[in-house]
Amino acid sequence: MKEGIHPEYREVVFMDVQTGNKFVTRSTIHTRETVEIDGKTYPLFKCDVTSESHPFYTGAQTRIVETGRVEKFRARFARTAGTVKSAS
C-alpha cells in the first residue's frame, strides 16, 4: 500500500444526542470536537440517532396503520358492487 494516501484510522467517541450515551469505536471520521474519557482525549462525533435511541432497537416502535390504495379500491368497489347500471 502507498504511504500517505489512506485516512487515519483511530479511536473516536460517538455520542447519541438524544440519550447522551457515548461509545468508543474506531473510525476515519474527521471532527473538531474532542472529549475526555478515562483520562484519554478522543475526537467526538455527535449522532442524531443510534441503536440506543432508534425506535426499532429500543422496542418503542409504533406502527402507522394507513389504508393503502388496494384497500381504498376494495372499499369503493364494495359499495357499488350491489348496484348495477341498467342499459337503456
Curated annotation (Swiss-Prot):
Cited InterPro entries: Ribosomal_bL28/bL31-like_sf (IPR034704), Ribosomal_bL31 (IPR002150), Ribosomal_bL31_B (IPR027493), Ribosomal_bL31_sf (IPR042105)
One annotated GO biological process: translation
Pfam families: Ribosomal_L31
The entry's keywords: Ribonucleoprotein, Ribosomal protein
Disulfide bonds listed in the record: none
SUPFAM superfamilies in the record: L28p-like
Gene Ontology molecular function, alphabetical: structural constituent of ribosome
Sequence similarity: Belongs to the bacterial ribosomal protein bL31 family. Type B subfamily.
The protein's name: Large ribosomal subunit protein bL31B
